[in-house]
Amino acid sequence: MSENQDTQKSFLETVKFDDRGLVPAIVQDHETGKVLMMAWMNLESLKMTLEKKKACYWSRSRNKLWLKGESSGNMQDVHDIMIDCDGDTLLLKVSQKGGACHVGYHSCFYRKTTDGEQMEICDTLMFDPEEVYGKKS
């Protein structure tokens, strides 16, 4: 397909959702390039994200739309949405307010290993999840 033909298709027509109607979305800080999280999107959440310029995902555990930051206030303003060469993965470039991770860190990728056994925290704790979401029963 030529470059011209490739850009003639609409963005939504290009996205290849899986058999559950989902596509993975990698979320990246628009200024630093730091990877913040990975989430799932369906057609409805993608359309809402495009319309509102706020990240909206599909929660597989709750089986419903999830506007990022709706309960915590840690919203994601969307600057760009990119699609990979196969059309089966999205990259959202966002400005993150507060932490992206539900356990309180700036990024969900807040742990690292150098030896394959021990882990260390390599990110900034932005908030106390118990204060934001309440204690788990």
Swiss-Prot record:
It catalyses: 1-(5-phospho-beta-D-ribosyl)-5'-AMP + H2O = 1-(5-phospho-beta-D-ribosyl)-5-[(5-phospho-beta-D-ribosylamino)methylideneamino]imidazole-4-carboxamide. Pfam families: PRA-CH (PF01502). GO terms for cellular component: cytoplasm. Binds 1 Mg(2+) ion per subunit. Binds 1 zinc ion per subunit. Catalyzes the hydrolysis of the adenine ring of phosphoribosyl-AMP. Homodimer. This is Phosphoribosyl-AMP cyclohydrolase. The lineage of its organism: Bacteria, Pseudomonadati, Chlorobiota, Chlorobiia, Chlorobiales. The gene is hisI.
